[in-house]
Amino acid sequence: KSVLGAVNLVNTKISKKLIGANIHDQTRIDTILINLDGTRQKTSLGANAILAVSMAAKKLSAKIKRVSLYKTFLVKNNYRLPYPLMNIINGGAHANNGLRIQEFMIRPDKAKSFSEAMRICFVVIDNLRKLIIKKGLSTSVGDEGGFAPMISSNEKALDLVVAAINKSGFKNGKDVSICLDVAANEL
């Protein structure tokens, strides 16, 4: 739909259906718009009209409430940082060490806070560093900040990560989980 056609639809067909709708009920407004269009691909009213009206309603609701627009998207107030996936061994395109998996990461499942999550990760990383040194390997880092030792296989890298988790006093898969970025597009 053209922009002028969208404006015409808003001023005629859409506005009539929205009169009396609660401006603070975004779900209801969007449902009215979707039902009014009636097509799966929104081809009757068109995205120019539907999106513009939906966004305008959301902005008006924020203005009436006297809050920043982004605050109208918040569902609850108990904010918390997500737990990190810590990159601890690099391979693939991020390191010149022969490993095919690009990133071996850990996720601190046991943590009850972000600071505890970071502490758990640092303990595992420190123990991984000690294990790498004990094996006579380099603790140089790859492009993404994980260690990039010359290890002969992905399995041996995983064994090292599991050993570091265990040495740190954690249980693999319970307290700390292993995550992989296999970068399949690079295989």
Segments from the language model and where they lie:
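Metal- or metallocofactor-binding catalytic centers and their adjacent structured scaffolds
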Residues: 1-63, 67, 118
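Flexible, glycine/charged-enriched surface loops at secondary-structure junctions
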Residues: 23-29, 47, 69-72, 129-147, ...
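Flexible, glycine/proline-enriched loop segments at strand-loop-helix junctions
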Residues: 40-48, 104-119, 145-152
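Conserved phosphate/anionic-ligand binding catalytic regions in large, soluble enzymes, centered on
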Residues: 41-62, 83-99, 143-147, 182
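Glycine/threonine-rich beta-strand-loop-alpha-helix active-site module
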Residues: 66-85
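Mobile "lid/hinge" segments at catalytic clefts and subdomain interfaces of large enzymes
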Residues: 79-142
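Catalytic core of soluble alpha/beta enzymes
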Residues: 155-187
